[in-house]
């Protein structure tokens, strides 16, 4: 019985260690409210593989994460733990980042774009080299006490009780298209929390901001005449679209990728925001500092890039196309 218990405990410990090192100790979907990246977790096949191993040392070596970043963190962790004067928060920070690197995320391939939300930065990698890098603005942090406040809102249904949560979700997708001079379909949440009040305070706000108002799919000819006091924010029957142009909140470029959160990368008409240290200020989408440079990297074709430039009233790089540009202007 003692030997049997020892065998069971050893097997259980080996399985737990394998899962911890190979998959991570935490399921990120349980940690983050807006985590939409597919993550591989332990299953019966992984357990069977551990139990059937004939070389434990080989197994322990094979499950160690091999990424250069992980190995750097391993070295740093050993160094800080050996130094009695090291600050505990540094050890904790390293351990948290090692845990993130254990999560089995989808293969990114040789070329990919990474938006680092805490760092407010975007980097385009190719074969581990950096093609381009720029600042970004991301979604604002959720309101303090959000969990309790959202419960209150769900009970009351009163928008005044609704707490703010504009955090940019964590997701994985593929960039598939560029929209030039985009129209902004204003989300219901922004219409209720911002557009409604702006229109109440200033009857000409909508027309001055190039915002069109629609009712049951039809555009209202004179939105300045709408009597907003007749409508509640909770049951606002209108849809709002901001036309393309200099004042458009999306700027001149919108970069689209599939996701269930209506998130995209885009230009902005508020360039001063990139001078701020804390750039968690958007409603969730990601504003990019250098949209033209990002577009050039994305299309990878000089002719297409010149087409994009001319669509936003910029001269083409190819001087042979200047006649086309002047005619367009």
Residue ranges of each PLM-predicted region?
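Well-ordered beta-sheet/strand-loop patches within structured domains
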Residues: 8, 12-16, 20, 28-35, ...
């Amino acid at each position: 019985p003692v030997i049997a218990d020892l065998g069971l405990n050893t097997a259980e410990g080996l399985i737990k260690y394998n899962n911890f090192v190979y998959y991570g100790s935490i399921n990120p979907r349980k940690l983050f409210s807006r985590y939409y990246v597919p993550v591989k977790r332990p299953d019966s096949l992984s357990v069977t593989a551990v139990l059937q191993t004939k070389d434990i040392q080989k197994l322990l070596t094979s499950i160690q994460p091999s990424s250069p970043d992980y190995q750097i963190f391993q070295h740093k962790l050993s160094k800080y733990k050996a130094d009695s004067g090291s600050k505990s928060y540094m050890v904790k920070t390293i351990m948290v980042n090692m845990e993130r690197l254990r999560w089995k995320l989808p293969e990114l391939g040789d070329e990919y774009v990474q938006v680092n939300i805490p760092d407010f930065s975007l980097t385009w990698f190719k074969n581990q080299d950096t093609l381009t890098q720029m600042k970004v603005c991301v979604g604002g942090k959720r309101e303090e006490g959000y969990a309790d406040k959202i419960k209150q809102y769900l009970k009351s249904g009163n928008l005044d009780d609704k707490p703010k949560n504009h955090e940019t979700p964590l997701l994985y997708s593929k960039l598939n298209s560029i929209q030039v001079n985009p129209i902004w379909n204003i989300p219901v949440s922004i219409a209720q929390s911002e557009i409604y009040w702006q229109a109440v305070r200033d009857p000409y706000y909508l027309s001055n901001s190039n915002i069109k108002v629609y009712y049951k799919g039809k555009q209202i000819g004179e939105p300045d005449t709408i009597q907003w006091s007749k409508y509640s924010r909770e049951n606002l029957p209108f849809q709002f679209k901001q036309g393309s142009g200099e004042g458009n909140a999306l700027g001149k470029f919108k970069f689209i990728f599939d996701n269930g959160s209506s998130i995209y990368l885009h230009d902005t008409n508020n360039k001063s925001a990139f001078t701020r240290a804390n750039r968690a200020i958007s409603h969730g989408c990601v504003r990019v500092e250098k949209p033209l440079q990002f577009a050039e990297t994305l299309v990878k074709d000089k002719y297409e890039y010149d087409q994009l430039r001319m669509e936003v009233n910029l001269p083409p790089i190819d001087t042979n196309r200047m006649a086309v540009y002047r005619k367009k202007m």
